[in-house]
């Protein structure tokens, strides 16, 4: 079974009738296959911004994900230093999810079918981050309107049923995290993803203030690197 079929270009008006015929035939063979919209417009199911993350939450019901090479291009890059790093992957993934999309990292093999060791290492690092923070990424949704972010270093997602909001700090918040657009339920337990210890929090004039334990100021005692997720049950959930 084919989950997704990626078309990569517009072939022009002379070829279009054959392309359309092929698309319709594919739909008959497998109605639930998802087709990339590039070159086929409304016949497609999802679209793919390439080489950039949209600047704001996308006002669309059409699925989308960013495609971005880890090196200098989607083909094999032999230079280790050209690979952008696990921190770059995580930051852009969180940013894309907060805006209602997803993030695909592109890497290419060499002539023998092998991937660069640096690319493999960086993907594994990002995978370790996802093991800790996946609850705030997988099957989540963007928050409404402009609530996807607070400033440059805070991003949000929510569960489909709205019973949990996830705040991601793209920079370590220090001893306190202030969230201005989330109001927790009175009995909400706020915790950092990857830990079981409830965090103390209070409502202030600025919003909700979450206190980070002194022990976590030591990098080695944090559950992950790059970005830190906090799970909150919002008021009314």
Task: Locate each region found by the language model.
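Mature catalytic domains of secreted/periplasmic carbohydrate-active enzymes
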Residues: 1-237
């Amino acid at each position: 079974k084919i989950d997704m079929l990626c078309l990569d270009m517009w072939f022009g008006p002379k070829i279009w009738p054959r392309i359309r015929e092929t698309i319709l035939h594919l739909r008959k063979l497998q109605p639930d296959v998802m087709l990339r919209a590039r070159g086929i417009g409304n016949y497609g199911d999802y679209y793919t911004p390439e080489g950039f993350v949209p600047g704001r939450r996308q006002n669309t019901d059409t699925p989308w994900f960013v495609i971005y090479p880890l090196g200098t291009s989607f083909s094999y890059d032999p230079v280790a230093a050209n690979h952008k790093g696990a921190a770059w992957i995580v930051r852009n993934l969180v940013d894309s999810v907060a805006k209602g999309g997803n993030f695909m990292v592109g890497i290419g093999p060499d002539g023998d079918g092998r991937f660069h060791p640096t690319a493999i290492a960086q993907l594994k690092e990002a995978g370790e981050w996802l093991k800790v923070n996946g609850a705030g990424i997988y099957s989540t949704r963007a928050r409404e309107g402009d609530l996807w972010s607070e400033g440059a270093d805070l991003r949000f997602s929510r569960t489909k049923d709205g019973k949990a909001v996830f705040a991601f700090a793209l920079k370590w918040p220090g001893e306190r995290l202030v969230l201005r657009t989330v109001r927790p339920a009175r009995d909400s337990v706020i915790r950092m993803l990857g830990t079981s210890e409830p965090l103390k929090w209070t409502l202030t004039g600025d919003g909700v203030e979450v206190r980070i334990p002194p022990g976590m100021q030591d990098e080695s005692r944090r559950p992950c690197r790059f970005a830190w997720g906090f799970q909150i049950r919002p008021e009314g959930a």
